[in-house]
């Protein structure tokens, strides 16, 4: 999840491959204009007609769309979101409507941050939003979701609503008492991962029936801020946080068949060049291009994993957060280091169209939102970054 809120700031040797990385300005990849306003911790999805929708996060209640099939591609503003400004929502298209699940925000300027469990949907035909008459079985912040078919979405992971909300209530209560606030922060972070009770239940929401189903549990610990991808009926749940500040390098893999999820053998990202171990990523970009699953960017706290192994529960205390620019590819069943992005970036929106993976917005190494749109494309054995 990355813990981007203001009070959370206290929170391989390079292989010679037949694949290479290149920065290209050729016609191999689609060039998209910048988003009208910088976007981090937002959400987005693409419909069946090649139209991308992004919004929320640092864009507040604003949403934008861009039609990839048009010769002249420009972002257009759509009707603002009625549910209030929020971050870390998940969105997918179901039955030709854009569904938005959960997030974290404030009910008003005086209230503390809190986890949402509501669902909204947007009609592109009518340009209208509607609150869906449902609530999720658990609060949804730091969760991830993938579309299973035209009526169902799989949602899993995320923070524990009660523990998360209590932290911000306590922070607000401490107010200007810096000593008390530091005590709240330390007590919150100085716990083992199991004490945060991150969600490990897998839920399936059916938009046609407006129902939720328990589809089992993750094969390991619950995570927050994971990246997820669905391809050829295989779900990949990539890294994420085990607790605030501590990532995992594990990638869960499952097969979706006959409305059943079957978990397969886990894999792990390799260490970055020059580093002894892979800390794991939160807020990474991901998507498929010509059959290769690409994962790039995100952020972590180098050294937090070793601290935690040594018994230091506040594992990222005193460690500067590092935004990443490495790109990894899953090639013939093995993860490989592929190269670097144009800049370190995380917590943006990943959208796949054809064999291009668009990286929309994100947070740079200064913690600032960006409005740029870049892309990954595998072409003739090369990873093209545009």
Curated annotation (Swiss-Prot):
- A Pfam short name: NANM
The EC code for this enzyme is 5.1.3.24
Query: For this protein, what reaction is catalysed?
Result: N-acetyl-alpha-neuraminate = N-acetyl-beta-neuraminate
Q: What is its main location?
A: periplasm
Looking up InterPro entries in the UniProt record yields: Kelch-typ_b-propeller (IPR015915), NANM (IPR056734), NanM_proteobact (IPR019936)
> Signal peptide: which range, if any?
1-29
Name the residues annotated as catalytic in the UniProt entry. 241
Q: Which GO terms describe its cellular component?
A: periplasmic space
Subcellular localization is given as: Periplasm
Q: Name one GO molecular function term.
A: racemase and epimerase activity, acting on carbohydrates and derivatives
Q: Which UniProt keywords apply?
A: Carbohydrate metabolism, Isomerase, Kelch repeat, Periplasm, Repeat, Signal
Where are the annotated Kelch repeats, by residue? 51-95, 97-149, 151-186, 187-232, 235-284, 306-355, 357-386
UniProt cross-references to Gene3D superfamilies, sorted A to Z? Kelch-type beta propeller (2.120.10.80)
Q: Does the keyword Signal apply?
A: yes
Q: Has keyword Repeat?
A: yes
The record's PANTHER family line, in alphabetical order, gives:
ACYL-COA-BINDING DOMAIN-CONTAINING PROTEIN 5, FIBRONECTIN TYPE-III DOMAIN-CONTAINING PROTEIN
Its quaternary organisation is: Homodimer.
Classification via NCBIfam families = muta_rot_YjhT, PRK14131.1
Family, according to the entry, reads as follows: Belongs to the NanM family.
Q: What is the documented function of this protein?
A: Converts alpha-N-acetylneuranimic acid (Neu5Ac) to the beta-anomer, accelerating the equilibrium between the alpha- and beta-anomers. Probably facilitates sialidase-negative bacteria to compete successfully for limited amounts of extracellular Neu5Ac, which is likely taken up in the beta-anomer. In addition, the rapid removal of sialic acid from solution might be advantageous to the bacterium to damp down host responses.
Q: What is this protein called?
A: N-acetylneuraminate epimerase
UniProt lists the gene as: nanM
